[in-house]
Amino acid sequence: MTDYSSKEYFDKLEKFWRAANYLSVGQLYLKDNPLLKRDIKPEDVKVHPIGHWGTIPGQNYIYAHLNRVINKYGVNMFYVEGPGHGGQVMVSNSYLDGSYTEAYPAITQDEEGMKKLFKQFSWPGGVASHAAPVTPGSIHEGGELGYSLSHGVGAILDNPDQIAAVVVGDGEAETGPLAASWQHNRFINPITDGAVLPILDINGYKLSNPSLTSRMSDEELTEFFHGQHWDPYFVEGDDSEAMDPKMAEVMDKAIEKIQEIQKNARENHDETMPYWPVIVFRSPKGWTGPKTWDNKVIEGTFRAHQIPIPVDQKNLEHVDALIDWMKSYKPEELFDENGRVLPEIAEIAPKGEKRMASNPITNGGVNPTDLNLPDYRDYAVDTTKRGQNIKQDMLVWSDYLRDVITKNPTNFRMFGPDETMSNRLYGLFEVTNRQFVAPIKKDWDEALAPEGRILDAQLSEHSAEGWLETYTLTGRHGIFTSYEAFLRVVDSMITQHFKWLRKADELDWRNDYPSLNLVSTSTSFQQDHNGYTHQDPGLLTHLAEKKPEFIREYLPADANSLLAISPLVMNDRNKINLIIASKQPRPQFYSMEEAEVLAKNGLGIIDWASTTNGEEPDVVFAAAGTEPNMESLAAINILHDNFPDLKIRFINVVDLLKLQSPKVNPNGLSDEEFDRYFTKDKPVIFTFHGFEDLIRSIFFDRHNHNLHVHGYREEGDITTPFDMRVLNELDRFHLAQDTINSIPEFAEKGADFSQQMDNTLERHYQYIRDNGDDLPEVTNWTWKDVN
């Protein structure tokens, strides 16, 4: 029986660590001569060594000891690399345990494979200096700091047999998202979820400044973590052999504590919030590397952050120092003559799917399944009298989502920053609660329970987005709903997720993922008491600038349209789906059959709102969004009343990026299809929920440039719903006026009409200031048939 705390085992562990360090240094500098069998020549060295050293040895040490507890306790564990610029860590360790070669057979576990391994790192056509999708075992790249712990938690939700070993960099720990993440333990259910083991990796320095936690004593950190309901364990040193027994003891205690918490919770149904373990690990930055250089201290300082020794292909003056550094790891004790890791070292790596880089959770999840969806038609809204049935789209949709939860009790969740109720998803609470493991005050709290399918009890967009990202990367499904303006808080996170999807899609060995579904509600065009700060539809533009193969933007005009796109979104793969949906009472216009056609085609000509009678239109109205649709229809009523001979074509757009040219978007309409909708030269009055330049950019590649866009113009205030549209000239009166002015044969005889619209707008201006409400002709408007 293996003694995992014997000197013999620790000796093997030390060699494994040294081998990982050797491989990590080699990846920085070399592209040939990986075993240093001969003198280094210029052609052995990279022209521009690129990468980082400072965080590597400490993480390699942690990784080796995590392998030890995997072997000892048989746990399923995966590694989340929080510190920035530590790309070699997961590459080197997965190469040593064989999982890297399984993903990349050309990178063999011998001298030739090691040569390729070294050359490809931070090399054109090679691999990144972060834990990018090309890295086996990674679900978190770490290029943008702050999300490691939320990613670890998202992955272990509903995965009760998994442990996320989350290494938190001491620089990363200073970011806002990571600071919020220490409160994630309040949402981990010890019965139904797995566990996270955070390891705060304190090496003292960031890029050029000291890390703040490194200037805190163990007592201060203990107080901090106890206050956050964690149980801290400390390991510190710079002598690895002396540290091994202590590190092993702390790791053992942490794993046993996790197992004890879970055993008690699962056997006794004890959902009390536990004190989960956290490890605080202190080691020098750039540990085992050059001690000094040019009379300045390197190891243990910020100077170890990147490339410690100035050696490159054109500058071999100090190559002896590089050789001494690499030989300090005694490669002859680690690899045989052919470059294969020695059997006694290889044998201590976990085997099969117990290897962290081969854990299936890191490659699309453990037994992922599609959603079992209810029939969205069962929730259809009656639109027999168009526009007269007033409903809240999100409220209607919540009944559908309620039944999605019922049918998928372990692989579907809703996420948000304390906004699920505000966003009118009332139906969810008929069947589930907000998951909340912290103490609950039953007399005052609402819909809180230790187990629930809603995670929105932390007011942090970063947390909700981070949880959803890895919940989907590990094969499950979810939706993040948020106020429209504050999805912008995480637009950089969303960009990072897009970059992950794009790069992962290029890898044959990577399984695909359920799509990331974002719902933007509490939208800009009705904020009531919130005002200007809550008005920003810019995520539409932000995402439209990404590779369109991975982005969909849906703007359903009413509840049936929202329902009709649901199956397209719910079981979609490898995309980011953005849905703009209204939570306010709005007229319902489209039958379910019409909504299905719009969802399938992305857009459609609405015959009942058009007055062309099969002829060429004088003007094309197009609407993308709830308020744009409503105001366009109201404008059509005004125009038809005043100009009954005006031939109007009305188009409702649901899938916005379908309008992009196929030169930009392979899913886009051909020029011929586009012209059939929008003509080649007739004026197009395009009403849009977002910033106008996005529509202008779409039309730039098309024949028809006779475009008049009415969207969000960065005008806002605390005001009435209709006045928000007036401020941005997205209202029916401005639209009708612009329509007549854009058609030469109507513009001259329409002068009086244009003045009439101005007069109405002036009356509106005064009325809302006198009465605090919109004009009766606006609030009481209903659709009048134009055919």
Curated annotation (Swiss-Prot):
UniProt keyword Lyase, yes or no: yes
Cofactor section: thiamine diphosphate
EC number: 4.1.2.-
GO terms for biological process, alphabetical: carbohydrate metabolic process
Endpoints of the signal sequence: none
GO terms for MF: aldehyde-lyase activity
InterPro entries: Phosphoketolase (IPR023962), THDP-binding (IPR029061), Transketo_C/PFOR_II (IPR009014), Xul5P/Fru6P_PKetolase (IPR005593), Xul5P/Fru6P_PKetolase_C (IPR018969), Xul5P/Fru6P_PKetolase_CS (IPR019790), Xul5P/Fru6P_PKetolase_N (IPR018970), Xul5P/Fru6P_PKetolase_ThDP_BS (IPR019789)
The keyword Iron-sulfur is annotated on this UniProt entry: no
Keywords assigned by UniProt, alphabetized: Lyase, Thiamine pyrophosphate
Gene3D superfamilies in alphabetical order: 3.40.50.920, 3.40.50.970
Top-level taxon of the source organism: Bacteria
Family affiliation: Belongs to the XFP family.
PANTHER family linked: PHOSPHOKETOLASE-RELATED
NCBIfam families: PRK05261.1-3, PRK05261.1-4
Name of the protein: Probable phosphoketolase
Organism from which the protein derives: Pediococcus pentosaceus (strain ATCC 25745 / CCUG 21536 / LMG 10740 / 183-1w)
Lineage, top ranks: Bacteria, Bacillati, Bacillota, Bacilli, Lactobacillales
